[in-house]
């Protein structure tokens, strides 16, 4: 029996560029610990922006159609924007989650390093071996010259060094075109079943070689087909979720091959290639005529399901080196593109993901417009609407949005698409003109639509503007209460359909979003590891895919935390991938590190592409900055890290540090009430020059060709105001690299790096009488943590920007000032342009920034999306090398920053 090649589950390529980091660049003694906790906190913080329940409105009485009722607008309480005196329960729980995350990380690395992948080695066919005729080759051998030309590695001497997990190439004496097994003749190109191991379904393959080895054994080579359950999806094939169903006759052609002895062949199987874009009726007939069919290929690299380039399944290499864009000129992209596409941003937050996608797409020549956005956090919606005034921003739950879309389609069919419905308009108008009772009020017009929400029952509600009353008196009325106003409904629906206030199936070109999965967080003590989708806190993943299934966009991009690939054997990540494949989308999955795209922040996230079979599947942009990729991934996703192989030597920019991002910002105090001020100085670095660019220079067309508001001003440069005790503590943290609570008087470090009280020093008190060093700092992570009241330094990077700014258990104090990082400083670490203004209380602004997708990562993905959308991204390579000028655009205006006059005093407030 022949040795087998690496299976799809085994890592056969280096997943990332891994080198030892320099000690002077990053304080490595604590960075990996910080990364785990920060990532955990980022997962936790999603809760604030994308899920949960709003405070209920006061109960209200339903009244007949045109009767006015009390205001039912939703209100949200405003939190006090001052740091709490001590960590709350959620902050303290971070220590427990961090320890659990660290254990999970170690387990993942161990699995990736030591777990051997399953290899497709055929088993001897007992029936064939026991038959009257031994398996044999038939006909004359292939001519020697032809054989050496077709299969050179079988005859030449191996010169390249074999990789540790690479199968040794069997050498051949001669090749044949056919063979006989159990009295059945098999030819090259035949599709066959191959005997698998005990209790395993037989393998399916296409014969590509028959040869006699130098050991005189008879071999055949198969190029494997994979059932859905053979891929990374595996056990998710049979889960019971509405709309999630795989055709058991559908298989996927791969590039994986194995050599096996001839008597492993069981029988022939009829497999046909089905063009995914062929006529549905013809497709159904073709599928009916065969045993199995395939319409896509499967590759372990980036868990890729993609169109097959030709009927015979020939596809390109999965290496990065074949795709380059050195010849791409971004200078021509400085004017507004003419080709447009529409975008729906789900779980949008303040809009980081969609903003980045649109910026990157513009560079590729595609004008991607965020036409719709949905989020449950009202402050995030306010921020997005301000920065994208043309976007229809909806402050509601995603499942209510989906229900609304379905009801909207019914209304459009009734009032727009069905011509006969217009015939009743005169009768409707006559009915609406009937005399009023004295307690009735006239509906002037309908100005909004929603589905349920707040304390309302499920169903369609219209926002009513009453004749003679101002907008503050508008109310939400159920559609049944407006039965006397069919003409008003008709007018609203027809106008809304014309303006596309809500998308219908076919209206959306791209859907992006990051559905929150709080059920996998360490803060959830009752996590369902066996069936995560039965946890209500994970249901948004199902809702996201349900919206995709309903609207059928051309492209899908889903973002999430890496834990979806780790928790419960990657259940949620596999589910998302499985849904897209079941819906006949092409798909691929990759993990990207924000620092690799020009930020002083590590922040690893998962990005899942989906593309209709009629479109080009986008690639992942290769890193542009030299950042060490740390951390492991589950074995099933070990080849999904977007990075250069360690054998490659790309020309990358030097990794950015904290000082590169924020050293130009003016000094502010612990309490800074003003959210608009002057810069007070010029930018000092390339990053700072870029981040200060105007909307037009950055190719942000949210305000058309004109300038947006507040351009050239410094926005949201406000820190979370520390309470008096914490402010006094922060003032005593030394201004030096690595400083934290351990530097305070009365603390010393004992054995095993565990802090303890210095018995020779009386416990120091604050002016309030409380201890200088709080107990929670001493006990955090069992006394081993360096985080409480930690000070950042200019030559460091931040593991992950989170949603909280309290210094109790994270390193967030400014390098030289007695305060935490401001909202704007955090926003810069996330890559938000300085013109991007945020709304809401200060704590809410931190939440918006921490929950966002890093803008430069989304921008790089947007460029790849634009390339694919415009048909300019060719080949099956999953990775794309961005143009050299990409890191310093916009185009010809890369160096033009619109800084404030140098003479303006730092921190001076500009009154609005």
Swiss-Prot record:
Catalytic activity, as annotated: a 2'-deoxycytidine in DNA + S-adenosyl-L-methionine = a 5-methyl-2'-deoxycytidine in DNA + S-adenosyl-L-homocysteine + H(+)
GO annotation terms (biological process): methylation; negative regulation of gene expression via chromosomal CpG island methylation
Domain SAM-dependent MTase C5-type: 341-872
Domain BAH: from-to ranges: 184-309
Gene Ontology terms, MF aspect: chromatin binding; DNA (cytosine-5-)-methyltransferase activity; DNA binding
Subcellular localization(s) per the UniProt record: Nucleus
Compositional bias ranges of the Basic residues kind: 43-69
Domain of life: Eukaryota
Matching CDD domains: BAH_plantDCM_I, CD_CMT3_like
Biased composition (Basic and acidic residues): 21-30
Record-listed E.C. numbers: 2.1.1.37
The Chromo domain, residue ranges: 441-504
Pfam annotation, one family: BAH
Biased composition (Polar residues): 312-324
The protein, known as: DNA (cytosine-5)-methyltransferase 1
Protein species of origin: Zea mays
Gene name per UniProt: MET2A
């Amino acid at each position: 029996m022949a040795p087998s090649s690496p299976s799809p589950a085994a890592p056969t390529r280096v997943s990332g560029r891994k080198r030892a980091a320099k000690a002077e660049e990053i304080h490595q003694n604590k960075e990996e610990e910080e990364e785990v906790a920060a990532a955990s906190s980022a997962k936790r913080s999603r809760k604030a922006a994308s899920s949960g329940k709003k405070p209920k409105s006061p109960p209200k009485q339903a009244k007949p159609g045109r009767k006015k009722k009390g205001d039912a607008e939703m209100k949200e309480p405003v939190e006090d924007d001052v740091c709490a005196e001590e960590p709350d329960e959620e902050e303290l729980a971070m220590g427990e989650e961090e320890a659990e995350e660290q254990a999970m990380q170690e387990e993942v690395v161990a699995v990736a390093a030591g777990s051997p992948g399953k290899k497709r080695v055929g088993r001897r066919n007992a029936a064939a071996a026991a038959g009257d005729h031994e398996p044999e080759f038939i006909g004359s051998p292939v001519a020697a010259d032809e054989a050496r030309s077709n299969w050179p590695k079988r005859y030449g001497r191996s010169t390249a060094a074999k990789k540790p997990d690479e199968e040794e190439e069997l050498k051949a004496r001669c090749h044949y075109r056919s063979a006989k097994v159990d009295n059945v003749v098999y030819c090259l190109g035949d599709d066959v079943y191959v005997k698998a191991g005990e209790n395993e379904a037989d393998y399916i393959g296409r014969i590509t070689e028959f040869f006699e080895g130098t050991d005189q054994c008879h071999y055949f080579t198969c190029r494997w087909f994979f059932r859905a359950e053979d891929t990374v999806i595996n056990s998710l094939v049979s889960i019971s979720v509405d709309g999630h169903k795989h055709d058991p006759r559908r298989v996927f052609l791969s590039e994986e091959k194995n050599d096996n002895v001839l008597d492993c062949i069981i029988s022939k199987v009829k497999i046909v290639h089905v063009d995914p874009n062929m006529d549905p009726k013809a497709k159904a007939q073709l599928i009916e005529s065969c045993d199995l069919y395939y319409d896509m290929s499967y590759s372990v690299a980036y868990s890729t399901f993609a169109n097959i380039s030709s009927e015979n399944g020939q596809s390109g290499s999965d290496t990065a080196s074949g795709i380059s864009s050195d010849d791409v000129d971004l200078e021509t992209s400085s004017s507004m593109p003419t080709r447009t596409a529409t975008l729906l941003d789900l779980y949008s937050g303040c809009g980081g993901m969609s903003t980045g996608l649109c910026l990157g797409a513009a560079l590729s020549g595609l004008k991607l417009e965020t036409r719709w956005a949905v989020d449950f956090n009202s402050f995030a919606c306010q921020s997005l609407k301000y920065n994208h005034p043309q976007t229809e921003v909806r402050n509601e739950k995603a499942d209510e949005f989906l229900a609304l879309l379905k009801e909207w389609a019914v209304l459009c069919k009734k009032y727009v698409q069905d011509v006969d419905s217009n015939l009743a308009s005169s009768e409707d108008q006559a009915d609406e003109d009937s005399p009023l009772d004295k307690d009735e009020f006239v509906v002037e017009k309908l100005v909004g639509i929603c589905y349920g929400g707040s304390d309302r029952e499920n169903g369609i509600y219209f926002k009513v503007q009453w004749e003679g009353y101002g907008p503050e008196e508008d109310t939400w009325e159920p559609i049944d209460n407006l039965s006397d106003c069919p003409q008003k409904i008709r007018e609203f629906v027809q106008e809304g359909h014309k303006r596309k206030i809500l998308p219908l199936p076919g209206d959306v070109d791209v859907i992006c979003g990051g559905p929150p999965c709080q059920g996998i967080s360490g803060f959830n003590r009752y996590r369902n590891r066996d069936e995560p989708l039965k946890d209500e806190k994970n249901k948004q993943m199902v809702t996201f895919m349900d919206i995709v299934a309903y609207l059928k966009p051309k492209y899908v991009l889903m973002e999430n935390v890496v834990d979806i690939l780790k928790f419960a054997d990657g259940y949620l990540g596999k589910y998302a991938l499985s849904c897209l494949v079941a819906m006949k989308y092409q798909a691929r999955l990759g993990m990207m590190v924000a620092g690799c795209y020009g930020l002083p922040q590590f922040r690893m996230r998962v990005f899942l592409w989906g593309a209709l079979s009629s479109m080009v599947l986008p690639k992942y942009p290769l890193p542009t900055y030299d950042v060490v990729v740390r951390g492991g991934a589950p074995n099933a996703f070990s080849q999904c890290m977007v990075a250069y192989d360690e054998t490659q030597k790309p020309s990358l920019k030097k990794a950015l540090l904290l000082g590169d991002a924020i050293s130009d910002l003016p000094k502010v105090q612990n309490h800074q009430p003003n959210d608009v001020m002057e810069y007070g100085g010029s930018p000092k670095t390339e990053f700072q020059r870029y981040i200060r660019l105007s909307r037009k220079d950055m190719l942000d067309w949210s305000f058309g060709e004109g300038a947006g508001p507040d351009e050239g001003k410094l926005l949201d440069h406000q820190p979370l105001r520390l309470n008096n005790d914490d402010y006094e503590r922060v003032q005593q943290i030394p201004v030096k690299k690595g400083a934290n609570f351990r530097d305070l008087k009365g603390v010393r470090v004992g054995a095993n790096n565990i802090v303890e009280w210095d018995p020779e020093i009386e416990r120091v008190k604050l002016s309030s009488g409380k201890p200088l060093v709080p107990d929670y700092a001493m006990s955090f992570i069992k006394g081993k943590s360096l985080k409480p009241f930690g000070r950042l330094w200019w030559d460091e990077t931040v593991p992950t920007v989170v949603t909280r700014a309290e210094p109790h258990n994270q390193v967030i104090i400014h390098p030289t000032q007695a305060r935490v990082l401001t909202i704007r400083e955090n926003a810069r670490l996330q890559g938000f342009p300085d013109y991007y203004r945020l709304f809401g209380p200060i704590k809410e602004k931190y939440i918006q920034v921490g929950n966002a997708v890093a803008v430069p990562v989304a921008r790089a993905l947007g460029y790849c999306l634009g390339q694919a959308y415009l048909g300019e991204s060719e080949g099956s390579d999953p990775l794309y090398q961005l143009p050299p000028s990409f890191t310093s655009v916009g185009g010809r205006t890369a160096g033009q920053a619109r800084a404030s006059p140098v003479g303006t005093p730092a921190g001076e407030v500009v009154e609005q």
